Swiss-Prot record:
<dbReference type="GO" id="GO:0000028">
    <property type="term" value="P:ribosomal small subunit assembly"/>
</dbReference>
<keyword id="KW-0690">Ribosome biogenesis</keyword>
<protein>
    <recommendedName>
        <fullName>Ribosome maturation factor RimP</fullName>
    </recommendedName>
</protein>
<dbReference type="InterPro" id="IPR003728">
    <property type="entry name" value="Ribosome_maturation_RimP"/>
</dbReference>
<dbReference type="InterPro" id="IPR028989">
    <property type="entry name" value="RimP_N"/>
</dbReference>
<dbReference type="InterPro" id="IPR035956">
    <property type="entry name" value="RimP_N_sf"/>
</dbReference>
<keyword id="KW-0963">Cytoplasm</keyword>
<feature type="compositionally biased region" description="Acidic residues">
    <location>
        <begin position="199"/>
        <end position="210"/>
    </location>
</feature>
<dbReference type="GO" id="GO:0006412">
    <property type="term" value="P:translation"/>
</dbReference>
<feature type="region of interest" description="Disordered">
    <location>
        <begin position="197"/>
        <end position="279"/>
    </location>
</feature>
<dbReference type="InterPro" id="IPR036847">
    <property type="entry name" value="RimP_C_sf"/>
</dbReference>
<dbReference type="Pfam" id="PF02576">
    <property type="entry name" value="RimP_N"/>
</dbReference>
<dbReference type="Pfam" id="PF17384">
    <property type="entry name" value="DUF150_C"/>
</dbReference>
<comment type="similarity">
    <text>Belongs to the RimP family.</text>
</comment>
<dbReference type="GO" id="GO:0005829">
    <property type="term" value="C:cytosol"/>
</dbReference>
<comment type="function">
    <text>Required for maturation of 30S ribosomal subunits.</text>
</comment>
<dbReference type="InterPro" id="IPR028998">
    <property type="entry name" value="RimP_C"/>
</dbReference>
Length: 279
């Protein structure tokens, strides 16, 4: 009983945790609309980004308090957020709505993100800078303080001869931060996925010829990147059936809505979410 109460308390604290970065202009207005909609569903906003390449795209990155985000989560967010954006009419032109998880090499937008990323490599950019320098790259070795008063200790991998290897960066000056996609980061994500499956009592699948077991339902980032693709199931009519994978935290998830209105979940990068233009 006590553990359940503590989990609920921790989850509530994470939901209420403010972001350290903020959008500007139209993206800021979208973030203002999206935040309460996401909160009502139990999700947190990570960031909003607008892209004008190949038409206007509104990219909204969200997550659960524990960092997880499945295809079904993306679908739920899209279904709730799309009408809210329609009512407010923030974007004055036709656009595509893309809902995604933060992914493995995720942005770091809250103090808790930095705490979870201890010993991982990150790129951090400050607004004003420290000793004339704005961009840093290195291993996150510690986080002290809370909120905007927190500071991050970085063991720099970009330090030149004569420069200090350790940098203490104030998060109230944070402009942007993101994890660097490394082999260690991928292994850590896979270990976390296996641990999550073990807690749920899901059996682990052993790869042929020995080696590390791959978590069931894990989405691939590319052909053969982590595990061979399973054989496609077929319906009674002989047509392939696409199953929605259940993804662990850290695996990139995206969602798109086709023009016909049929919803299709995706578990790969680079697939935009197409939002039908109201007639």
């Amino acid at each position: 009983m006590g553990n359940a109460t503590q989990v609920e308390t921790d989850s509530a604290a994470l939901m209420a945790e403010p972001r350290l970065v903020a959008e500007t202009g139209v993206a800021a207005r979208i973030a203002h609309i999206a935040t309460p909609v996401l909160a009502d569903l139990g999700y947190r906003l990570v960031r909003v980004k607008l892209s004008a390449q190949d038409g206007m795209t509104v990219q909204i990155m969200a997550e659960r308090p524990d960092g997880a985000m499945t295809v079904n989560d993306c679908e739920a967010v899209s279904a709730a957020l799309s009408p809210a954006l329609d009512v407010e009419d923030v974007v004055k032109q036709a656009y595509r709505l893309e809902i995604s998880s933060p992914g493995i090499d995720r942005p770091l937008v809250r103090v808790s993100d930095f705490r979870r990323a201890l010993d991982q490599e990150a790129r951090i950019e400050l607004r004003l800078g420290l000793d004339g320098r704005k961009r840093f790259r290195g291993l996150i070795k510690g986080v002290t303080g809370a909120g905007a008063a927190a500071v991050v200790t970085l063991e720099r991998v970009d330090a030149k001869p004569g420069e200090a290897v350790e940098a203490v960066l104030p998060l109230d000056d944070l402009a942007e931060a993101k994890l660097v996609l490394t082999e260690e980061l991928i292994r850590a994500a896979l270990r976390a996925a296996k641990a999550a499956l073990a807690e749920e009592g899901e059996p682990e699948e052993q790869e042929e010829g020995g080696g590390e077991a791959a978590p069931a339902g894990k989405a691939e980032r590319g052909p053969g990147r982590f595990t061979p693709k399973p054989a496609k199931a077929k319906s009674a009519q002989g047509k392939p059936v696409k199953a929605k994978p259940v993804l662990p935290a850290g695996v990139k998830t995206q969602f798109k809505q086709l023009k016909s209105g049929r919803l299709q979940g995706l578990a790969r990068e680079g697939a935009p979410a197409l939002r039908p233009t109201p007639k």
